[in-house]
């Protein structure tokens, strides 16, 4: 059974603006924000008690504009961090529509807009969300490279594009290492619309050495898989812990932007999130 079929009757997905024609409201409307319970996929992963990781979902906002007190348009770039312990993730299309609602709204200052975002996003997520807005001249603009070794250049024949955690069976070697690996070949699909989500993923771990071919095949198997960005990264973390037994693990993905937003989920049992620096595809 596909993830779409599995979640087809989920009440949490009913009424989402995602996949529907939407009116673009240009006056401030926090009611546009829509939460999705994280339990929707965490129950499936057995994550019903204390979480085995900490982390956050870091969003970058590229299309944010409002009017100042005199009616002149203002623009900024934003960084939002939603804690992984929050009850809900924030549905991305509703986030975009919410940001658009600032377009014809008069606000006294950048700080006032930032405070509105903190209040509304925290209410949607069910936990305190941090927001930083940058005037364009102060916005981070460096294009970064992922840390560690890329596993994408392996010359392998691939024929499995349906998600299969069993591709990690036997991926844990005998020698203990600490290493960082990354791949740019992560691709999954939106749970509701099946639109492609393109990402790059970093895996930093201590424990039995990972078989890089098996790891790459596993990551490629997400190619026809339907789940939200955040859910995919928690699935990768959980599968690696269960099947490869690292003593310490970080899984961090950076997805390409859609609708002026990019989502960058970070999950770890031993590290804090890195600086939010975009990749070449972002």
UniProtKB/Swiss-Prot annotation:
Keywords: Cytoplasm, NADP, Oxidoreductase, Queuosine biosynthesis. GO terms for cellular component: cytoplasm. GO terms for molecular function: preQ1 synthase activity. The keyword Chaperone does not apply. Substrate binds at residues 90-92, 229-230. NADPH binds at residues 92-93, 258-259. The keyword Oxidoreductase applies. The active site is at 190 (thioimide intermediate), 197 (proton donor). Pathway: tRNA modification; tRNA-queuosine biosynthesis. It is found in: Cytoplasm. One of its GO terms (biological process) is queuosine biosynthetic process. Catalyzes the NADPH-dependent reduction of 7-cyano-7-deazaguanine (preQ0) to 7-aminomethyl-7-deazaguanine (preQ1). Homodimer. Belongs to the GTP cyclohydrolase I family. QueF type 2 subfamily. This is NADPH-dependent 7-cyano-7-deazaguanine reductase. It comes from Aeromonas salmonicida (strain A449). The lineage of its organism: Bacteria, Pseudomonadati, Pseudomonadota, Gammaproteobacteria, Aeromonadales. The gene is queF.
């Amino acid at each position: 059974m596909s993830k779409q079929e599995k979640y087809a009757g989920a009440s949490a997905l009913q009424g989402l603006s995602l996949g529907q024609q939407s009116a673009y409201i240009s006056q401030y409307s926090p009611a546009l924000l829509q939460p999705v319970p994280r339990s929707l996929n965490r129950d499936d992963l057995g994550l019903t008690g204390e979480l085995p990781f900490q982390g956050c979902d870091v969003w970058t906002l590229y299309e944010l504009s409002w009017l100042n007190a005199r009616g002149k348009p203002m623009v900024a770039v934003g960084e939002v961090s939603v804690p992984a312990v929050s009850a809900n993730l924030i549905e991305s299309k509703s986030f975009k529509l919410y940001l658009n609602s600032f377009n014809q709204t008069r606000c006294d200052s950048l700080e006032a807009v930032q405070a509105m975002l903190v209040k509304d996003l925290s209410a949607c997520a069910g936990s305190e969300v941090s927001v930083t807005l940058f005037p364009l001249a102060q916005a981070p603009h460096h294009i970064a490279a992922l840390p560690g070794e890329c596993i994408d250049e392996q010359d392998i024949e691939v024929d499995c594009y349906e998600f299969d955690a069993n591709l990690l069976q036997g991926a844990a070697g005998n020698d203990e290492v600490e290493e960082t690996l990354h791949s740019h070949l992560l691709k999954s699909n939106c749970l509701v619309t099946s639109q492609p989500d393109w990402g790059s993923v970093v895996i930093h771990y201590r424990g039995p050495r990972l078989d890089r071919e098996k790891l790459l095949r596993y990551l490629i198997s997400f190619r026809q898989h339907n789940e939200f960005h955040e859910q995919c990264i928690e699935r990768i973390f959980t599968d690696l812990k269960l099947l490869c037994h690292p003593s310490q693990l970080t899984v961090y993905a950076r997805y390409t932007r859609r609708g002026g937003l990019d989502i960058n989920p970070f999950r770890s049992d031993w590290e804090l999130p890195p600086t939010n620096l975009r990749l070449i595809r972002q």
